[in-house]
Amino acid sequence: AAELAALAIEFDAKLAVVGDEACLPELRAALAGSGVVAAGGRAALVEAAARPVDMTVAAIVGCAGLAPVMAAVERGGTIALANKEALVSAGEVLMQAVARHGATLLPTDSEHNAIFQCLSGNRIEDVAKITLTASGGPLRTWSAER
């Protein structure tokens, strides 16, 4: 909460939200007198993501980040997606919502961004195969055959 408060103050944020409501008292104390509003919990995350802003950075770990990402998409905004789980768990639904609401999804997760950069300026029809390497995750110990 202290790090979030410091960033909120540094970047003149209007609102700082923690997902874990147990951290809210610490966040409020760290933001006291700053003018930054503190909020906590799942509903606060979704409400924050639905606000009209220039860009939403979605970096909540795991599937917990899906509801805020969908709220930002439904607003029709630009979302810098640093959470690959939203795509893994609900990619088809998410991409349909992006198209329906005119949202823009920018990949900021390292692997997704690497593909995005490689494809930039190329026609997708000209790409036959993409090989994605990874530095970790649950498949890191699997053989290539598996």
Task: Give the ranges of each region predicted by the language model.
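Rossmann-fold NAD(P)-binding glycine/threonine-rich loop
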Residues: L24-G33, R42-V46, A59-R75, N83-T104
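Short coil/turn connectors at secondary-structure junctions
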Residues: D12-A13, G33-S34, R51-M55, E74-G77, ...
